[in-house]
């Protein structure tokens, strides 16, 4: 089986949830949550994870509207993703991320690992779900 190293991203206005996968491309794991302050800071932190994980691709959750259209937030995510893809010199694949934050919160609550104060945990878990969906679709 071909080795794959991907980073899953749940991009929001305030935070970016980051997930990575094992070398076999079977299991996604939450890595960190980046608190967004500036584009430069976002890029620097993502670049560190790309280097550390030897990432070959970015898998980004795209927040489609419930009717399947691309709303304002989805277009903002695409715009940001085009910029980071260019700077980091990595290809991007999008995954439909509708309801991943709801699913992430439910998973964390069921695992008793949820605090209403830790929004970053939801973002990390959402990034994990996004990346896992992409990994599963490749099998």
From Swiss-Prot:
Keyword annotations from UniProtKB, A to Z: Cytoplasm, Hydrolase, Nuclease, Ribosome biogenesis
EC number of this enzyme: 3.1.-.-
GO biological process: rRNA 5'-end processing
Keyword Hydrolase included in the entry's annotation: yes
Gene3D superfamilies, sorted: YqgF/RNase H-like domain (3.30.420.140)
Subcellular location: Cytoplasm
Cysteine disulfide links: none
InterPro entries in the cross-refs: RNaseH-like_sf (IPR012337), YqgF (IPR005227), YqgF/RNaseH-like_dom (IPR006641), YqgF/RNaseH-like_dom_sf (IPR037027)
Top-level taxon: Bacteria
This protein's record includes keyword Transferase: no
Name of one Pfam family that matches: RuvX
GO cellular component, one term: cytosol
Predominant location category: cytoplasm
GO molecular function, one term: nuclease activity
Function as written in the Swiss-Prot or TrEMBL entry: Could be a nuclease involved in processing of the 5'-end of pre-16S rRNA.
Entry-linked PANTHER family: POLYNUCLEOTIDYL TRANSFERASE, RIBONUCLEASE H-LIKE SUPERFAMILY PROTEIN
UniProt cross-references to HAMAP family, sorted A to Z: Nuclease_YqgF
Protein family per UniProt: Belongs to the YqgF nuclease family.
UniProt name for this protein: Putative pre-16S rRNA nuclease
Gene source species: Rippkaea orientalis (strain PCC 8801 / RF-1)
Lineage of source species: Bacteria, Bacillati, Cyanobacteriota, Cyanophyceae, Oscillatoriophycideae
